[in-house]
């Protein structure tokens, strides 16, 4: 599955300068001591994915993680079994921590120490709800920062998300001021959202972090 997915991605970007990422998410099992999956088993599962896709990838993205222990296993597997840049993102709750209780500061310090090439948040919340979380990450790492927020929450009747493309881009101004380097979107976003963000960034280039 991984090899075929990477092959299709390569075919889709042929003739362009678009980069292809080997995207890795959670395994779907909790690691010990919260769950039953051993750290070594998680490492081997991530290694299998990396070995299958690294030859066709320009970088590795590890995202939507809630457990610092699991993202540690994934990052170590990536760093020890490839020479590709590795971007690492976790997803946070409204209380400012991940589902398993990891703080933005702990995430930033740990992942930089393990050799990540960029850190950030994806999925999680709307842009306006991620301000303090990303700000805290920025205070604890010198790595490039990434944001891929949700477009708010979907309406249970219409299934439309609460943050429009225009508002999404406007809310991203905060992160440009903060010096976030890489921008994207998660649940509820579409190419229209990315176009609006790009237009905003042309007018408001990300500030250089000190």
Task: Please tell me what each predicted stretch does.
Residues 1-210:
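Domain-level signal for soluble alpha/beta catalytic cores
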């Amino acid at each position: 599955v991984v090899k075929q997915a990477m092959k299709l991605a390569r075919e889709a970007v042929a003739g362009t300068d678009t980069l292809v990422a080997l995207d890795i998410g959670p395994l779907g099992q909790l690691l010990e001591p919260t769950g039953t999956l051993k750290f070594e088993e998680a490492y081997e599962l991530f290694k299998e994915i990396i070995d299958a896709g690294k030859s066709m990838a320009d970088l590795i993205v590890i995202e939507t993680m809630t457990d610092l222990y699991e993202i540690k296993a994934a990052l170590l597997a990536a760093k020890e079994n490839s020479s590709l840049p590795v971007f690492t993102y976790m997803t946070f709750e409204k209380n400012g921590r991940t589902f398993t209780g990891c703080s933005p500061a702990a995430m930033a310090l740990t992942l930089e120490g393990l050799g990540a090439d960029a850190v950030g948040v994806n999925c999680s919340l709307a842009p306006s709800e991620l301000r303090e979380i990303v700000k805290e990450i920025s205070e604890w790492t010198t790595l490039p920062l990434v944001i891929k927020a949700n477009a708010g929450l979907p309406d249970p009747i219409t299934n439309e998300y609460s943050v429009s493309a225009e508002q999404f881009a406007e809310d991203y101004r905060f992160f440009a001021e903060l010096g976030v380097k890489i921008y994207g979107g998660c649940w509820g976003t579409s190419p229209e959202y990315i176009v609006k963000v790009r237009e905003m960034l042309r007018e408001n280039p990300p500030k250089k972090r000190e």
